[in-house]
Amino acid sequence: MGSILSRRIAGVEDIDIQANSAYRYPPKSGNYFASHFFMGGEKFDTPHPEGYLFGENMDLNFLGSRPVQFPYVTPAPHEPVKTLRSLVNIRKDSLRLVRYKEDADSPTEDGEKPRVLYSLEFTFDADARVAITIYCQAVEELVNGVAVYSCKNPSLQSETVHYKRGVSQQFSLPSFKIDFSEWKDDELNFDLDRGVFPVVIQAVVDEGDVVEVTGHAHVLLAAFEKHVDGSFSVKPLKQKQIVDRVSYLLQEIYGIENKNNQETKPSDDENSDNSSECVVCLSDLRDTLILPCRHLCLCTSCADTLRYQANNCPICRLPFRALLQIRAVRKKPGALSPISFSPVLAQSVDHDEHSSSDSIPPGYEPISLLEALNGLRAVSPAIPSAPLYEEITYSGISDGLSQASCPLAGLDRIMESGLQKGKTQSKSPDSTLRSPSFPIHEEDEEKLSEDSDAPLPPSGVELVLRESSSPESFGTEEGDEPSLKQGSRVPSIDDVLQDGSPQHHGCSQPVPPADIYLPALGPESCSVGIEE
C-alpha cells in the first residue's frame, strides 16, 4: 500500500514484478509494506513496517494476487480525498442457505437416503443494473483489472441473473443447488495455499457501454460450516469492492450502524451499547476510529488525550497504531428545512467547537456521523412537532366563526400547587408559562389582570379555562379557597359541555368572556377532557 504510493510519488509508475509471482502474506522475500503510509493526503511514519493498519495481516490474502497500477493522480496536500461510489452492495448478514430435499418419487438406491441440496439467498442494494453470478470452489484471476473467477467444474457455476436498480432486492435461484455430499471437508473452507474460495458471489454493474461504471463490481467471499447433526451453514469471509479496476477490501467499523429502526425494536440487553457518545467522556459524539481494531468509540478531545496517556483501545485493550478521525460534511443548504428537535443532533453543534475547521472544504459544513448515515428527520406535515414548553393543545370550544385551539399551560404546576392548601397565589399571569405561538399584548395584560381580580365561587383548587373571541387573551388561574361547602353542587361534565357548546352563541355577535370551572380532585384522579 505505502510502497506503491511512494513509488508513484517518486515518478515510477511501472511495477517490475514477474507475471507468475503472486502476492501472499507472509511474502517469501522482502517486505510487504514500506516504513511509511499516506492517509488523508499526509505522510506518516510507522514503527511497524509490516503492520497492516486496518486489520490482520492475513486479510491481505483476500486481495488480488497481482498488483495493479493506481489509476488516480496523486491529490494535492490540501485537496479533499476523493470518495469512491459504491453502486452495488450485498448485505452479508442476509446470506443464508436454503435446504431442499429430493422428491420421494426420484429414483434412489435401496437403503439410500434422499440427498439434501442447498441453495443461496441474500439481499442486495443496487444503484445500477447488475448481473449476479455464483461460483463454487473458484479461483480468482485479474484480467485488465477485472476479477475473473473460474470453477474446476462447470456445474459449480450458476447462471447469470440480471437485476434492475433497486433497494432491498432479494436474490433467490432455486435452479442452482449445492450438493455437499460431493464435497471434501477441506473444500468447505478457504484454501490459502491454492487460493480456492468455497463460494464467490459476484455482482457486476451491467450498464452497457457507460465508461464511468465500467469495471465496477462487488464480490462476497464466503465459506461453509458443517454441524454435528450433518447440516450446513454459510459464513461470510470478506467483501471486496472493485472500482475503476482497483480492488478494495471492505472492513467493518465497530460502533456505528444504521439506527433507523433502533427505537422500534426493544433491546434484549439493557447494558448493550446503543448510544453514539464517546465511551470516555460520555458527552461528545464519537468520531475517531482506533486502528487496527477498528473501534469507533472516541471523540476528538479524548482521542488527543489518549495519544499521550495510553496506547490501548478502551474497548478491547489491544495496542493501537493510529487514530483516524472520520468527519462527515455536506454542502451548505440555501434554505434550511424544518427538522424536529433532537438532542443528538443538537449536541453535534456543540461538538463542532472541539474540532478545527481547517480541513473542511469551502462551501461545506460538518455534520455528525449519525446524520450522515440516517439523514435528517424531516417533520411530517400531518404530525406537528413536539412542544418545546409545557404546552398541551385541546381542540373544542369554538368562537362561532373558526375553531380555536386552547393551550393548557402549566398543568403539572397547577396539580402540585393543589396539594399545598392555604398558600397565597399570585393573581398576575406567569410570563414563563406563555406559549411562544400565542403572544400577549398590553391590552391583553389589562384584561387578564381584571379577570384575575374577579371573585371566584367557593370550590377547591380549580382549573379555570377562559374563552374569548380571540385566542390570544387566554390565561390560567388557580383558586385558593380551602374546600367545597357542604350541599354545594359540583357541575357535571354535561353542564360543562352544554355551557361551552357553540349553539348558545350567535355567529353575528362577539362572544363575551365565559368561565368554566373544573374541580381538581387531586393528582391521582385528575383527568381533563374537552371535546366538541
Curated annotation (Swiss-Prot):
The UniProt annotation puts motif Required for TSG101-binding at 384-387
Q: Which residues carry this modification: Phosphotyrosine?
A: Y389
Location(s) in or outside the cell: Early endosome
Q: Name one GO molecular function term.
A: ubiquitin protein ligase activity
Please give the tissue specificity annotation from the record for this chain. Widely expressed, with highest levels in brain, heart, kidney and liver. In the CNS, especially prominent in the Purkinje cells of the cerebellum. In the skin, expressed in the basal layer of the epidermis and hair follicles, primarily in the outer root sheath. Isoforms 1, 3, 4 and 5 are equally expressed in the liver. Isoforms 1, 3 and 4 are most abundant in brain, kidney and heart, respectively.
Listed Polar residues bias regions: 422-435
Pfam annotation, one family? zf-C3HC4_3
The disruption phenotype is: Mutant mice have a pleiotropic phenotype that includes the absence of yellow hair pigment, curly hair and whiskers, abnormal craniofacial patterning, reduced embryonic viability due to mispatterning of the left-right body axis and age-dependent spongiform neurodegeneration. Many months before onset of vacuolation, mitochondrial complex IV expression and activity is significantly reduced in mutant brains and oxidative stress is increased. A global reduction of ubiquitinated proteins in the brain is observed.
GO aspect biological process, one term:
protein-containing complex assembly
Q: Where is this region: Disordered?
A: 419-518
Gene3D superfamilies named in the record: Zinc/RING finger domain, C3HC4 (zinc finger)
Q: Where is the composition biased (Acidic residues)?
A: 442-453
- Its top-level enzyme class, in one word, is transferase
Specify the pathway: Protein modification; protein ubiquitination
Q: Where are the zinc fingers (RING-type)?
A: 277-316
Q: Which UniProt keywords apply?
A: Cell membrane, Cytoplasm, Endosome, Lipoprotein, Membrane, Metal-binding, Myristate, Nucleus, Phosphoprotein, Transferase, Ubl conjugation, Ubl conjugation pathway, Zinc, Zinc-finger
Its GO CC terms are:
early endosome; endoplasmic reticulum; nucleus; plasma membrane; ubiquitin ligase complex
Superkingdom classification of source: Eukaryota
Please outline how this chain is modified post-translation.
Autoubiquitinated in vitro.
Q: Which PROSITE patterns match?
A: ZF_RING_2 (PS50089)
Report the domain remarks: The RING finger is required for ubiquitin ligase activity.
**Protein purpose:** E3 ubiquitin-protein ligase. Mediates TSG101 monoubiquitination at multiple sites. Plays a role in the regulation of endosome-to-lysosome trafficking. Impairs MC1R- and MC4R-signaling by competing with GNAS-binding to MCRs and inhibiting agonist-induced cAMP production. Does not inhibit ADRB2-signaling. Does not promote MC1R ubiquitination. Also acts as a negative regulator of hedgehog signaling.
Subunit details? Interacts with MC1R and MC4R. Interacts with TSG101. Interacts with mislocalized cytosolically exposed PRNP; this interaction alters MGRN1 subcellular location and causes lysosomal enlargement.
Protein name, UniProt field: E3 ubiquitin-protein ligase MGRN1
